[in-house]
Amino acid sequence: MNKIIIGTRGSVLALWQAEYVKAELERAHEGLSVELKIVKTKGDKILDVPLAKVGGKGLFTKELEEMMLQGEIDLAVHSLKDVPVELIEGLTLSAITEREDVRDCFLSDKYASLETLPLGAKVGTTSLRRSMQIKSMRSDLDTESLRGNVQTRIKRLKEGDFDAIILATAGVNRLDLWKEVNYVIPIDTEMMIPAMGQAALGIECKEGSEAFRLTQILEDKKARIETTAEREFVRVLEGGCQVPIGANAYLEGETLHLKVAVGLPDGSEILMDRLSAPKGEAVRLGRELAARLIAKGARELLRRAEEMAFQ
């Protein structure tokens, strides 16, 4: 195979990610030609509705997966946090890349932190997970849906539509957005637990394909272990990408730690827990922590969270 086609979404961040994968593949495999094919997903087309109300799984991946199965593209580059925990039969995550900074990031032109926002300040976010944790800290804050690409979100912040917005620090780093507004402050994971898979790229392709073999050079063992625990936790809970679940695993030596949060989007109820295990037991760790939260009522909380999101 001397040519492969990568499917990618068309946002600046998605293209940065696809170009990174393209460069790594061409560097590692002499004579390989890599082409990018831009694909609009359902999540890209519906911008006037909060993601949770759009509903369904694979909002940013399904069209890319269908094109892979039809042979129109050889692989897709995803933000791993957007990839459903159950993949379509015949497809696999051939590589999970080294993680960028996993933290969420606070951006504002006027205020230096969530704590210093005035009463009733308006915070823009795409995520029920972020909204849940913001409201659990500051129930007075007004969290509102903020859709669109990163540049659109920052533009709306600068125009005064919001007092602050929350983005992923990984995206801020990749697009070098540190000087876009006055305050760009990563939020400690003890304060806001990230989404499963946050800051890693997931490379998806057909099982046993040549693309699978070629993309092995992108695999990061640490990221694979951490995100396996996170994704297994969400899978057992039967939560999708658009429900208020935080899951952050991190390796320290031979020990894998996992901390999680599940609750209602308004932050009025939230379950948090953490557990550790040997690094070779990522799946068990995710399952065990999910079972603990299910015993505390997590599935019922998520059912209520979905109802609230659709109101």
From Swiss-Prot:
Pathway: Porphyrin-containing compound metabolism; protoporphyrin-IX biosynthesis; coproporphyrinogen-III from 5-aminolevulinate: step 2/4. Signal peptide: none annotated. Keywords: Porphyrin biosynthesis, Transferase. Pfam families: Porphobil_deam, Porphobil_deamC. GO terms for molecular function: hydroxymethylbilane synthase activity. Its cofactor is dipyrromethane. Belongs to the HMBS family. Monomer. This is Porphobilinogen deaminase. It comes from Wolinella succinogenes (strain ATCC 29543 / DSM 1740 / CCUG 13145 / JCM 31913 / LMG 7466 / NCTC 11488 / FDC 602W) (Vibrio succinogenes). The gene is hemC.
